[in-house]
Amino acid sequence: MTDTEFGYVHGLAEDYLKYVLQIQQPGSKPSKTSRVLQDVASSVQDEVERTLKQCLDKFDVVSVDTARTIFNQVMEKEFEDGIVNWGRIVTIFAFEGILTKKLLGKCIASDMDMCKDISFFVAEFITENTGEWIKQNGGWENGFVKKFETKSGWLTFLEVTGKICETLCRLKQYY
């Protein structure tokens, strides 16, 4: 399986949600790509949740369908200019984590089926809308990992935080 195929991306999306929700998987260790993604996206997600708390508090994620609707609206705005880059792709994962936490905050118990549904539509979006760009830019292992693994944490953090703040500020027009 190549790193631009749906199954690979879906695995990254599922691994990220397990990381965000602190779900331990006995006997399985995330790939290097998954670990780098978790580090970068969770840093961005944490900062966004802290700095944009008031904005995020204004929207309710009460179902997977609501999460999908919000996700599609935000991604449509995020990519309407046709520009794809690694920072924007990281924001997709950070937003996946935010939506999932909002949804599970409304539920009595964690429902892994809901998480699987969210990781599915996130992976579907990434594969369909950024897959070709990812392939042209070295793929996950030779593009993404090389870009984010060797950079200073602050430079990466500032680059990606700017993108996700821009995206989430767009939520204000919907909620």
Swiss-Prot record:
<dbReference type="InterPro" id="IPR046371">
    <property type="entry name" value="Bcl-2_BH1-3"/>
</dbReference>
<dbReference type="GO" id="GO:0008630">
    <property type="term" value="P:intrinsic apoptotic signaling pathway in response to DNA damage"/>
</dbReference>
<dbReference type="GO" id="GO:0043066">
    <property type="term" value="P:negative regulation of apoptotic process"/>
</dbReference>
<dbReference type="Pfam" id="PF00452">
    <property type="entry name" value="Bcl-2"/>
</dbReference>
<dbReference type="GO" id="GO:0005741">
    <property type="term" value="C:mitochondrial outer membrane"/>
</dbReference>
<dbReference type="InterPro" id="IPR026298">
    <property type="entry name" value="Bcl-2_fam"/>
</dbReference>
<dbReference type="GO" id="GO:0008053">
    <property type="term" value="P:mitochondrial fusion"/>
</dbReference>
<dbReference type="GO" id="GO:0005737">
    <property type="term" value="C:cytoplasm"/>
</dbReference>
<comment type="similarity">
    <text>Belongs to the Bcl-2 family.</text>
</comment>
<dbReference type="GO" id="GO:0097192">
    <property type="term" value="P:extrinsic apoptotic signaling pathway in absence of ligand"/>
</dbReference>
<dbReference type="InterPro" id="IPR036834">
    <property type="entry name" value="Bcl-2-like_sf"/>
</dbReference>
<dbReference type="InterPro" id="IPR013282">
    <property type="entry name" value="Bcl2A1"/>
</dbReference>
<comment type="subunit">
    <text>Interacts directly with BCL2L11/BIM, BAK1, BID, BMF and BBC3. Interacts directly with PMAIP1. Interacts with BOP. Interacts with ING4. Interacts with UBQLN4.</text>
</comment>
<keyword id="KW-0053">Apoptosis</keyword>
<keyword id="KW-0963">Cytoplasm</keyword>
<dbReference type="GO" id="GO:0015267">
    <property type="term" value="F:channel activity"/>
</dbReference>
<dbReference type="InterPro" id="IPR020717">
    <property type="entry name" value="Bcl2_BH1_motif_CS"/>
</dbReference>
<dbReference type="InterPro" id="IPR020726">
    <property type="entry name" value="Bcl2_BH2_motif_CS"/>
</dbReference>
<comment type="function">
    <text>Retards apoptosis induced by IL-3 deprivation. May function in the response of hemopoietic cells to external signals and in maintaining endothelial survival during infection. Can inhibit apoptosis induced by serum starvation in the mammary epithelial cell line HC11.</text>
</comment>
<dbReference type="GO" id="GO:0043065">
    <property type="term" value="P:positive regulation of apoptotic process"/>
</dbReference>
<dbReference type="GO" id="GO:0001836">
    <property type="term" value="P:release of cytochrome c from mitochondria"/>
</dbReference>
<dbReference type="InterPro" id="IPR002475">
    <property type="entry name" value="Bcl2-like"/>
</dbReference>
<protein>
    <recommendedName>
        <fullName>Bcl-2-related protein A1</fullName>
    </recommendedName>
</protein>
